[in-house]
């Protein structure tokens, strides 16, 4: 059986194609990696890597062993997780991909509390993701709408409903609109996520109204910027009701709902996790997300 630290060194060299980069990734001296690779090659009786210019490439034997090194490391990780679960220990790393508009406020608080409860857990949080990226496989994706990526199960966390808002400063000099048809007479701050040829708004008593696409000097896909522009009195725009209520709580007197009762169709907030059995850290984090869902998302 090969030394696991030597297998890790070989795997890092395969990934980075450079002794310097692999040593940096493992936070180990280059001399240590060289020594472990030499010992592994001696144990196997085969040369695994060769240098071509400034890069390391696999030999034929290296290509064969690279497949098994992946399996050895995966098995080692699974065995470690199984032993830790006996004592309900949460360790390792979670890689999360989260929509930028979900991070501030809600998720940052969930993450902080979860990491306080599990002091040895590491979190890697990203806000950009391409479904076509077959190499990168995050543990969990939290996104607004979207179909489930291949190999992932979808779970709905809740809904956002958008409504129109203005600031008291803006309405101090203009009449407050009472029906969506009046919005065409006001400067419009366009939230790109809701931009359509037309936007369907609904009222529990008055039915539906199709709001045409309106000209806008400012278009943004960032909720914080959208709310700031509205609060500064630049015009009227859409915000999720949950986000607007939180913004108003943090900044009292900054936002006023317009055309009361009219809202967009619900927009799904989903999380996606891999099929199959999950490590304890992921199962507990998914439970934490479920428990932390705001009531306004229902």
Swiss-Prot record:
Residues 1-59 form the HTH lysR-type domain. The keyword Transcription regulation applies. Residues 19-38 bind DNA. One of its GO terms (biological process) is DNA-templated transcription. The keyword 4Fe-4S does not apply. It comes from the Bacteria. Pfam families: HTH_1, LysR_substrate. Keywords: Activator, DNA-binding, Transcription, Transcription regulation, Virulence. GO terms for molecular function: DNA-binding transcription factor activity; sequence-specific DNA binding. Transcription activation of the irgA gene. In the presence of sufficient iron, transcription of both irgA and irgB is negatively regulated by a fur-like protein. In low iron conditions, negative regulation of transcription is removed, and production of IrgB leads to positive transcriptional activation of irgA. PANTHER family: HTH-TYPE TRANSCRIPTIONAL REGULATOR (PTHR30537), IRON-REGULATED VIRULENCE REGULATORY PROTEIN IRGB (PTHR30537:SF66). Belongs to the LysR transcriptional regulatory family. This is Iron-regulated virulence regulatory protein IrgB. The lineage of its organism: Bacteria, Pseudomonadati, Pseudomonadota, Gammaproteobacteria, Vibrionales.
